[in-house]
């Protein structure tokens, strides 16, 4: 089944899970699409089975809190950042609920975490105005970059380069093998005083970069030239909430939730609005991602919703 405008418009909430007492701050699908794992401000980690459509287990990180949860390539392991006490990144085995390793270094809250798509490398960005490069096999930071402001960062789909959005006004591209030489490209965007950048993602085909903000606009950039191809607005975000925006796996569409529980979908190439879906969420849709392998997506406020198409194209 191929994603088309009409298939996207047909999506409806198939299941709602009420496992959390506070907002879900992040979730991540496994690369095979079979599970999704969430982190929440209630200090819990919930693992869901996407095929059976049910929660499998819940773990807790009471002392440090849990945010920015990401699967690693090893089965049943995740990395996540803390949202209280310290700013150490933790590497957890879900299998026995034990920490494998800690990654100390940041001295302010970690606001970005991206796992390499190809190996054990990951990068983190923090309010301490640094980006750090790590390897899961070592607690020591493998590289450090000092920046002029708050960073958001992400690997490209090949894992060869990473992009850093700095101070909500420029995107810098770094070669992973020689990042200490500085960026090989810098794209300066018009500075918007009304909002901050909160996320940065590449499309799976590597051609586009999506910049999300805590305001009412999203931007799509050409990943090679840095030109702004589209600015998307028209969704509600009056309170400056961090709303996750995502590409569909085929790189053709861009989705974002809103503070009123609705999901907005645009065509990434034409910039036309394709769908407006009502998730009936009780709060802002803080997290939204399409499953990498199956025709389903998930959205979350303090509840988690699984969506399915209602037509067979």
From Swiss-Prot:
Give any Pfam family that matches. Answer: WD40
> Is the keyword Cytoplasm assigned to this protein?
yes
SMART domains, alphabetized? WD40
Query: What is any one GO biological process for this UniProt entry?
Result: positive regulation of transcription elongation by RNA polymerase II
Q: Where are the WD repeats?
A: 19-58, 105-144, 146-184, 192-231, 237-276, 280-313
CDD domains registered for this protein in UniProt: WD40 (cd00200)
> Is RNA-binding among the key words of this record?
no
Q: Please give the PROSITE patterns that the UniProt record associates with this protein.
A: WD_REPEATS_1, WD_REPEATS_2, WD_REPEATS_REGION
Gene Ontology MF terms? chromatin binding
Q: Which GO terms describe its cellular component?
A: chromosome; PTW/PP1 phosphatase complex; Set1C/COMPASS complex
InterPro entries recorded for this chain? Answer: G-protein_beta_WD-40_rep (IPR020472), Swd2/WDR82 (IPR037867), WD40/YVTN_repeat-like_dom_sf (IPR015943), WD40_repeat_CS (IPR019775), WD40_repeat_dom_sf (IPR036322), WD40_rpt (IPR001680)
In which compartments does the protein localize?
Nucleus; Chromosome; Cytoplasm
Chief location of this protein?
nucleus
- Say which domain of life the source belongs to: Eukaryota
Task: Quote the Gene3D superfamilies the UniProt record gives.
Answer: YVTN repeat-like/Quinoprotein amine dehydrogenase
- State the UniProt keywords alphabetically: Chromosome, Cytoplasm, Nucleus, Repeat, Transcription, Transcription regulation, Transcription termination, WD repeat
Its function, per the record, reads: Regulatory component of the SET1/COMPASS complex implicated in the tethering of this complex to transcriptional start sites of active genes. Facilitates histone H3 'Lys-4' methylation (H3K4me) via recruitment of the SETD1A or SETD1B to the 'Ser-5' phosphorylated C-terminal domain (CTD) of RNA polymerase II large subunit (POLR2A). Component of the PNUTS-PP1 protein phosphatase complex, a protein phosphatase 1 (PP1) complex that promotes RNA polymerase II transcription pause-release, allowing transcription elongation.
Q: Which family does it belong to?
A: Belongs to the WD repeat SWD2 family.
How is the subunit organization of this protein annotated in UniProt? Component of the SET1/COMPASS complex. Component of the PNUTS-PP1 phosphatase complex.
What name does the UniProt record give this protein? WD repeat-containing protein 82
The scientific name of the source species is Danio rerio
């Amino acid at each position: 089944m191929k994603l088309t405008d009409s298939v996207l418009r047909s999506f409806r909430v198939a299941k709602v899970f009420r496992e959390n007492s506070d907002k879900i701050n992040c979730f991540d699908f496994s690369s095979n699409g079979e599970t999704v794992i969430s982190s929440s401000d209630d200090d819990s980690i919930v693992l869901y089975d996407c095929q059976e459509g049910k929660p499998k287990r819940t773990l807790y990180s009471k002392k440090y809190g849990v945010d920015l949860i990401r699967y690693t390539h090893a089965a049943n392991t995740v990395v996540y950042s803390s949202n209280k006490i310290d700013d150490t990144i933790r590497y957890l085995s879900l299998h026995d609920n034990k920490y494998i390793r800690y990654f100390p270094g940041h001295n302010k809250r970690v606001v970005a975490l991206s796992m390499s798509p190809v190996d054990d490398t990951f990068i983190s960005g923090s309010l301490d105005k640094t980006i750090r490069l790590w390897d899961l096999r070592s607690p020591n930071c493998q590289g450090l970059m000092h920046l002029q402001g708050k960073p958001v960062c992400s690997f490209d789909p090949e894992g060869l380069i990473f992009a850093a959005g700095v101070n909500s006004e420029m995107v810098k591209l770094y070669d992973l093998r020689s990042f200490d030489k500085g960026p090989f490209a810098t794209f300066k965007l018009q500075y918007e005083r009304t909002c901050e950048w909160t996320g940065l993602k590449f499309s799976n085909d590597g051609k586009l970069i999506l910049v999300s903000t805590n305001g009412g606009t999203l931007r799509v950039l050409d990943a090679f030239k840095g030109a702004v191809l589209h600015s998307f607005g028209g969704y509600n975000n009056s309170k400056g909430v961090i709303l996750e925006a995502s590409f569909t796996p085929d790189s053709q569409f861009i989705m974002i939730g809103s503070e009123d529980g609705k999901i907005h979908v645009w065509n990434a190439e034409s910039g036309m609005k394709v769908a407006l879906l009502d998730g009936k969420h009780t709060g802002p849709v803080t997290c939204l991602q399409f499953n990498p392998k199956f025709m389903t997506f998930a959205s979350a406020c303090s509840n988690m919703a699984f969506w399915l198409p209602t037509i067979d194209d």
